[in-house]
Each structure stands twice: as structure tokens, then as C-alpha cells.
């Protein structure tokens, strides 16, 4: 009897550790990405961030499935996100985008300084996004289920994923100053999206057991196969699609609101003539 109890205790402890191991995997990927950037291995750094996105999606899901969520897990996950999806992609964006520019020395120097500020701003916006998410999670535990299916502001892994996917698509660092300027505009826009109030879909409660589970599994298998064969293109398309999804939904809602205010009964009042 005691052996059975000890076995159940060990099993529970093991289940509790699983989400933390995934979070540690996220931290490892972030550290590996940073060291790869320092060595000039930009594609390796990008791949590490991509793997970290997978780990980040697994830890919370495992914690919910095993009922092993804890305040410790929430805090270490936030710290891991700052390092892996804040510091690592900011360094990658800076060194890949501005570390090899071919331009007049004085102009190139000013551009690098501006890029440094922009990449630091990305890190700050990412940290603010995580802080806002944590405070909203605490205050909305009794909120309707709808709030759990939407993020307020673009999640920081999405911004990091787009940076990593772009570098993975073209690992050669940017040399043209005009493209470097465009890259800094993109980083600035990602920073804005993280601290904005634009809603983004959350896949935290995506359930494969629903009625379309076979179709979902088939699509997942197809996506894995496509990523294996055409990772550069597919990952970039996925990253751009998610980042654009919030903007698309916001645009549609604004369009409907505008049309709703224009197409009132007074609009078609024929007594004005």
C-alpha cells in the first residue's frame, strides 16, 4: 500500500515538473539564440526562437491538461518570455538587420544608433505586453470564456516568430541601407502591435477532441510535412498570417461599424426631395 502511495506521489511530482521543463527548454532556446547571434550564426538563432515558440505553447497546455498550474509556473514563464522572445529577437533584429550595412560611414553609424533605440523599444514593448497580460489574467479570472479566446495586443512570441521567420527565409544579413530602414519600420510596427488593443486569437484552449478532430489532426500533419519540406516559405507565411490576422479583424469591424452608421434609415429617406 505504501509503495502504491509513493508511486502516485512520484507521478504527481513528475507531472508538476513537466510544464517547468518546457519553460526551461524555452530559456535554453533563448540563450542559444543569443549566443548564436554573437557568433554571427543568424539562421541558428532564428531556428532556436522557432523551437522556443513550440515549447512556449506546450508548457501552458500541459499545465492545464495535468491540472498542475501554479503561480511559480506563471512567473518563470513570463521571465522566460522576456529573455527568449524579447532580448533574443531584439538582438537578432539588430545584428542581422544593421550589422552589415554598406553605406556612407556617418550615415550608417546614425542608422545603427537609431536601430539600437528601435530594437530596445521592441524589448520594452514586449515586457510591457507581458506585464499587461499578467495583470489582466489576474483580474479576469471570473471573466466570460470569450476573453480567454482573445489576446489584447499581439503576443510577444508572434513578434519574435515573425523576426525569426524572416531571418530563416534569408539568413544573409541585410547590406542595403534602404532595406535596413524598412526592417526598422517593421520592428517599430511589431512593437506598436504588442502594446496596442488589437485583438488576436488565442489557441490556448484549442481542443483536438471536438467534432472536427480528424480534420484538425490531418491539417496538423499536413502543416508539419510542409514545414519539413519548405520551412523557409511556410514559416514566414504562418508568421505573417497571424500578425496580419488581428489587423484584418480590426479593419473588418471598423468597416462594419462605419457602414452601420452610414446605412441608417435616414440614409434612404425619400421625403427629402
Model-predicted regions and their roles:
Residues 18-24, 65-133:
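Multi-pass membrane catalytic core of lipid/isoprenoid biosynthesis enzymes
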Residues 1-7, 141-273:
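C-terminal membrane-associated helical module and adjoining short loops/tails
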Residues 61-71, 127-142, 195-204:
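C-terminal ends of transmembrane helices
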Residues 1-57, 238, 249-250, 259, ...:
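Topogenic membrane-insertion module of multi-pass membrane proteins
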Residues 118-156:
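Hydrophobic, well-structured mid-protein blocks that either form specific transmembrane helices
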Residues 28, 54, 58, 62, ...:
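Active-site His/Glu-centered metal-binding helix of metallohydrolases
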Amino acid at each position: 500500500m505504501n509503495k502504491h502511495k509513493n508511486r502516485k506521489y512520484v507521478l504527481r511530482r513528475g507531472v508538476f515538473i513537466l510544464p517547468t521543463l518546457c519553460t526551461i527548454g524555452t530559456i535554453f532556446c533563448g540563450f542559444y539564440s543569443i549566443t548564436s547571434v554573437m557568433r554571427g550564426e543568424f539562421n541558428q538563432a532564428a531556428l532556436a526562437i522557432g523551437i522556443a515558440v513550440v515549447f512556449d505553447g506546450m508548457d501552458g497546455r500541459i499545465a492545464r491538461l495535468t491540472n498542475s498550474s501554479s503561480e511559480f509556473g506563471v512567473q518563470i514563464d513570463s521571465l522566460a518570455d522576456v529573455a527568449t522572445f524579447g532580448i533574443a529577437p531584439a538582438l537578432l533584429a539588430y545584428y542581422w538587420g544593421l550589422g552589415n550595412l554598406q553605406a556612407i560611414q556617418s550615415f550608417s553609424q546614425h542608422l545603427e544608433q537609431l536601430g539600437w533605440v528601435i530594437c530596445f523599444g521592441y524589448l520594452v514593448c514586449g515586457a510591457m505586453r507581458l506585464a499587461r497580460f499578467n495583470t489582466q489574467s489576474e483580474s479576469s479570472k471570473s471573466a466570460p470564456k470569450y476573453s480567454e479566446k482573445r489576446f489584447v495586443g499581439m503576443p510577444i512570441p508572434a513578434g519574435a516568430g515573425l523576426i525569426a521567420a524572416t531571418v530563416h527565409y534569408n539568413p544573409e544579413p541585410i547590406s542595403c541601407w534602404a532595406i535596413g530602414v524598412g526592417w526598422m519600420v517593421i520592428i517599430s510596427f511589431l512593437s506598436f502591435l504588442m502594446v496596442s488593443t488589437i485583438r488576436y486569437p488565442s489557441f490556448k484552449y484549442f481542443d483536438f477532441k471536438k467534432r472536427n478532430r480528424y480534420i484538425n489532426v490531418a491539417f496538423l500533419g499536413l502543416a508539419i510535412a510542409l514545414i519539413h519540406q519548405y520551412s523557409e516559405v511556410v514559416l514566414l507565411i504562418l508568421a505573417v498570417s497571424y500578425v496580419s490576422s488581428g489587423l484584418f479583424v480590426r479593419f473588418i469591424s471598423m468597416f462594419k461599424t462605419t457602414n452601420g452608421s452610414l446605412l441608417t434609415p435616414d440614409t434612404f429617406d425619400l421625403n427629402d426631395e
